[in-house]
C-alpha cells in the first residue's frame, strides 16, 4: 500500500531573531512573562537532534530580513554575525535536505523598500493585498536572492500571515517569474492556505501553469497546537503528553493527524519556530519528539515523512491527479 506523505511545516525561523516577538500584539506571554527577542542557537541544535533521530521532514523557513533588523548576509541589528553564520551553517548542514528551505518573504514584519532596505509603514501582508505582479515580482525576487547568496537551494516560498491571498493570481504569477529569474527553476511551490476537516482530504494542487512553468499550492491541515507552550512554564511529562495528544494520542487512535489521515489528506502539520522554542524553554521541541515517537509507533506502515521539495516533485510528475482545487477553502483560526 502506498504510504501517505506527512510533512512538518515550520514557519518563522530566522537566525536568533524572534520575528514573533517583533510583531506580536503584546510583548508578554499570556502568563505575564516578557517575550524573549532572540532564541539561542542551542535550541536549533536540539531541534536538529530530534529531526535527525526520527527522520522528520518538511518545510523550514529562513526569513531573509527578520523583523526589519537588517539581513542575514550583511548583519542583523544587535546580533553577533558569528552566531548568525553558525545558525545558517547548521540549517544548511543539518536541516536540509530533509526540510525544504523557503523565504517567508523579506521581514515577516513591515514591508521593505527594496531599493533602500528600510521598513515601510504597512505590514507585509497588508502591503501585498493591494499589489500586482509588477511589484510583487521584484519583492519576491529580493527574498530569493538573499537566500541564494546564503547558499540555500530554494524551490518555493511561504506567505507571512496571508500574504498575497487577496491577489493570489498575481502573487503566484510573480512567484513563478521570480523563481525562474533567480534559480532557473520552472516548477515551484507556495504555502498560503490552511485547510482542515475537508471531506475527501486535502492534497497539493496545481495553482498556475504558463510558459512551461508550474506553481503548486501546498496547504496546511492542522492547527499549531505546540503554540500553547509559549504561554506556559510547564515542562513536565504530563504537559508534554497533553500537547502531543492534540496531534496523535498515546494509543494512536485520536488527534488531528489521525483525523486528517482518515479523511485522506496529505498530512501537512503546521507549527512555528516560536512554538517549538517555547519562549526559550524548548518545550515544543520535546512535544514534537513525542509526536514523532507516536507516529513511528502507530503509523509507520501508513505514512512517510516527506519534504516539500518531494511533494512538489510528486505533484509535477502526476499533474492530472493534482489539478482539483479543494471546494472548501475555509480559513482555520490559527495564531501566527
What do the PLM-derived regions correspond to, one by one?
Residues 53-54, 133-155, 177-186, 297:
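Secondary-structure boundary elements
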Residues 7, 19, 78-80, 89-90, ...:
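Active-site-adjacent pocket scaffolds in enzyme catalytic domains
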Residues 179-205, 253-257, 262-336:
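C-terminal domain-boundary segment and adjacent tail
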Residues 15-16, 67-68, 108, 274-277:
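A short, flexible beta-alpha/helix-coil linker loop
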Residues 10-12, 60-64, 103-107, 158-161, ...:
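A cross-domain feature marking catalytic cores of carbohydrate-active enzymes
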Residues 23, 107-133:
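Short, flexible helix-coil linker/hinge segments at the edges of structured domains or between repeats
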Residues 1-97, 142-146, 152-159, 269:
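Active-site beta->alpha N-cap acidic-glycine motif
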Residues 35-42, 64-86, 113, 132-137, ...:
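Acidic-and-aromatic substrate-binding clefts and catalytic sites of carbohydrate-active enzymes
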Amino acid at each position: 500500500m502506498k504510504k501517505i506523505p506527512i510533512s512538518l511545516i515550520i514557519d518563522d525561523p530566522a537566525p536568533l531573531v524572534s520575528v514573533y516577538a517583533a510583531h506580536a500584539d503584546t510583548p508578554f506571554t499570556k502568563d505575564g512573562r516578557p517575550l524573549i527577542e532572540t532564541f539561542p542557537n542551542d535550541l536549533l541544535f536540539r531541534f536538529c537532534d530530534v529531526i535527525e533521530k526520527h527522520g522528520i521532514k518538511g518545510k523550514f523557513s529562513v526569513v531573509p530580513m527578520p523583523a526589519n533588523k537588517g539581513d542575514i548576509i550583511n548583519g542583523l541589528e544587535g546580533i553577533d554575525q558569528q552566531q548568525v553564520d553558525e545558525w545558517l551553517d547548521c540549517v544548511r548542514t543539518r536541516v536540509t535536505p530533509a526540510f525544504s528551505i523557503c523565504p517567508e518573504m523579506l521581514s515577516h514584519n513591515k514591508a521593505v523598500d527594496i531599493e533602500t532596505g528600510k521598513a515601510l509603514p504597512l505590514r507585509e501582508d497588508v502591503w501585498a493585498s493591494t499589489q500586482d505582479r509588477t511589484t510583487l515580482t521584484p519583492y519576491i525576487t529580493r527574498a530569493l536572492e538573499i537566500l541564494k547568496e546564503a547558499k540555500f537551494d530554494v524551490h518555493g516560498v511561504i506567505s507571512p500571515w496571508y500574504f498575497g491571498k487577496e491577489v493570489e493570481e498575481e502573487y503566484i504569477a510573480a512567484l513563478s517569474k521570480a523563481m525562474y529569474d533567480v534559480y532557473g527553476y520552472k516548477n515551484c511551490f507556495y504555502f498560503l492556505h490552511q485547510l482542515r476537516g475537508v471531506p475527501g482530504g486535502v492534497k497539493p494542487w496545481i495553482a498556475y501553469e504558463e510558459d512551461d512553468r508550474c506553481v503548486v499550492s501546498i496547504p496546511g491541515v492542522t492547527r499549531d497546537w505546540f503554540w500553547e507552550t509559549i504561554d506556559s512554564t510547564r515542562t513536565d511529562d504530563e504537559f508534554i503528553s497533553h500537547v502531543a495528544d492534540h496531534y496523535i494520542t498515546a494509543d494512536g487512535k485520536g488527534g488531528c493527524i489521525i483525523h486528517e489521515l482518515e479523511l485522506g489528506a496529505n498530512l501537512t502539520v503546521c507549527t512555528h519556530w516560536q512554538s517549538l522554542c517555547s519562549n526559550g524553554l524548548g518545550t515544543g521541541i520535546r512535544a514534537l519528539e513525542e509526536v514523532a515517537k507516536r507516529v513511528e509507533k502507530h503509523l509507520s506502515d501508513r505514512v512517510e515523512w516527506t519534504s516539500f521539495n518531494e511533494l512538489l516533485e510528486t505533484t509535477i510528475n502526476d499533474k492530472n491527479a493534482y489539478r482539483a482545487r479543494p471546494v472548501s477553502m475555509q480559513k482555520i483560526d490559527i495564531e501566527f
